Amino acid sequence: MMQVLSIQNCATTKENPSSGKLIVLTGPSGVGKGTLMRSLLQRHPELYYSVSATTRAPRPGEVNGESYYFISRNKFEELLAQGEFLESAEFAGNYYGTPREAVLNQIQSGKLVVLEIELAGARQIRASFPEALSIFILPPSFEELEKRIRGRGQDSEEAIARRLQRATEEIQAADEFDIQIVNDDFEAALQAIEVALFG
């Protein structure tokens, strides 16, 4: 049985949350992280989902403040310089970052906080919060991943090639994370995440 550990002795951060729990969900673009996260939150409203900030344009159906905080590059760089992000990374030419204050407040109040972030950001979180539980979502195959990315119909061939190259590199990092879950059968993958979080 998997147990999610409380965050304690975060020696590499100024903050020292001791009562909450931090969960990091990551994996390559197109693997289904967002869909899994949405379903997880629908089933477990007690979870606190940290909404990331990004400089990329909204995709169809995305809502500002729910899917992401959509902000300008200048605003992002200003917040970054002020130390307002717990982690930040650049992906496909856009910045992504996790607002620091909201996450730390929720952890300190005893909440289970879940982050859905890119690999570079997940590595930053692991360095700052070694007690965090990290979950890496894998595709059933590289061919399926390419099919999913192409199925979005949003990227040029050049952008797709970049995403696939990056995915190859990211998949090689899966073993760095506490748990690896293959998103082949959606319901099974979702249940595996629930077991990791709740036992």
UniProtKB/Swiss-Prot annotation:
Residues 20-198 form the Guanylate kinase-like domain. Pfam families: Guanylate_kin (PF00625). Keywords: ATP-binding, Cytoplasm, Kinase, Nucleotide-binding, Transferase. Its EC number is 2.7.4.8. It is an enzyme of class 2 (transferase). Disulfide bonds: none annotated. GO terms for molecular function: ATP binding; guanylate kinase activity. ATP binds at residues 27-34. GO terms for cellular component: cytosol. It catalyses: GMP + ATP = GDP + ADP. It is found in: Cytoplasm. Gene3D superfamilies: Guanylate Kinase phosphate binding domain, P-loop containing nucleotide triphosphate hydrolases. Essential for recycling GMP and indirectly, cGMP. Belongs to the guanylate kinase family. This is Guanylate kinase. It comes from Trichormus variabilis (strain ATCC 29413 / PCC 7937). The lineage of its organism: Bacteria, Bacillati, Cyanobacteriota, Cyanophyceae, Nostocales. The gene is gmk.
